[in-house]
Amino acid sequence: MIIVVGIGADGMTGLSEHSRSELRRATVIYGSKRQLALLDDTVTAERWEWPTPMLPAVQGLSPDGADLHVVASGDPLLHGIGSTLIRLFGHDNVTVLPHVSAVTLACARMGWNVYDTEVISLVTAQPHTAVRRGGRAIVLSGDRSTPQALAVLLTEHGRGDSKFSVLEQLGGPAERRRDGTARAWACDPPLDVDELNVIAVRYLPDERTSWAPDEAFAHDGQITKHPIRVLTLAALAPRPGQRLWDVGAGSGAIAVQWCRSWPGCTAVAFERDERRRRNIGFNAAAFGVSVDVRGDAPDAFDDAARPSVIFLGGGVTQPGLLEACLHSLPAGGNLVANAVTVESEAALAHAYSRLGGELRRFQHYLGEPLGGFTGWRPQLPVTQWSVTKR
């Protein structure tokens, strides 16, 4: 059995009697250097510090035989090692004794409800994944450099006015809180930030919308416009944890909206134009999502992570591209393709006649001034073919 004991910055004094008893009866305890240093002299077990990288050492543990003990920060099941151990060895072989999490302590200090505060871990993730367009979050830092790195990104993406509080050594005798704005932390960060810190962010300006307008994206005109983007995402029907291939991605707007739709949704964007690839990366960072940006399709398909769903937004008439997309799609996966030219419409109509699926045509109008009145200006019609691979 592997027993995981959560411990806070207050060390042994903050533990329950059950947790203290487990540590005192242990023969071997694994943990980080900082966590092991929190144990007092009543704990006589041999102490093993995790190496870097840690995962190979964790995989080498054996839950058979004598009990193994692990110390972890706060609640080990909240972005902690407890989840990894259960995934590797099964819940029957792992017992978790949680402590109060840093998230709970931070929310208490800020006066925020835990249940409606987003939790983001930057322990291993890149800082741009914590960029948001509104709301509030507790961000778990990787180290002392994380607050400034996140503050710089927020400022670069127009979020410099965000309320930005760094809370250090939560629950311990050296606890400290420093309030400011993202812009202030980006321009003049303190030099003595503790390694053990979390960030409480209230994102400003608050521009949360279900569907971001076209002007929220960097693009050169190659973008699936807002009304069609909504219809396209409905046809793609994202589900949690699925991966999208956005082929002929243009601005990457479909990939970005896909990643925002459900937890765990990821995207790979294929785009031949270098400037557009830069736009995709910028848009992904601006919306706080991760999009794997690659080159021309289908040449860049080979070493990309396999898709659950494919959107073909450009290159429908490119010889062999539609067939390559269908070949890469797993059984049961959806492919959705949009067309605006007569030639690309013909290609989709031919695919529909061969493979079935659903063929739709969308036409929408925008109301615009017409003299002293209002008239309807037609937008380019869009033909859409969707099919499920059998």
From Swiss-Prot:
**Molecular function (GO) terms listed?**
precorrin-6Y C5,15-methyltransferase (decarboxylating) activity; protein methyltransferase activity
Q: What UniProt keywords apply to this chain's record, in alphabetical order?
A: Cobalamin biosynthesis, Methyltransferase, S-adenosyl-L-methionine, Transferase
Q: What domain of life is recorded for the organism?
A: Bacteria
UniProt xrefs under InterPro entries:
4pyrrol_Mease, 4pyrrol_Methylase_sf, 4pyrrole_Mease_sub1, CbiE, Cbl_synth_CobL, Cbl_synth_MTase_CbiT, Cobalamin_biosynth_MTase, SAM-dependent_MTases_sf
Recorded catalytic reaction(s): these are: precorrin-6B + 2 S-adenosyl-L-methionine = precorrin-8X + 2 S-adenosyl-L-homocysteine + CO2 + 3 H(+)
GO terms, biological process: cobalamin biosynthetic process; methylation
| Pathway annotation from the record | Cofactor biosynthesis; adenosylcobalamin biosynthesis; cob(II)yrinate a,c-diamide from precorrin-2 (aerobic route): step 7/10
| One of the Pfam families matching this protein, by short name | TP_methylase
Kindly give the Gene3D superfamilies that the UniProt entry links to this protein: Cobalt-precorrin-4 Transmethylase, Domain 1, Vaccinia Virus protein VP39
EC class: transferase
Q: SUPFAM superfamilies from the entry?
A: S-adenosyl-L-methionine-dependent methyltransferases, Tetrapyrrole methylase
EC number(s) given by UniProt: 2.1.1.132
Q: Please give the NCBIfam families that the UniProt record associates with this protein.
A: CbiE, CbiT
Q: Which family does it belong to?
A: Belongs to the precorrin methyltransferase family.
Name of the molecule in the record: Precorrin-6Y C(5,15)-methyltransferase [decarboxylating]
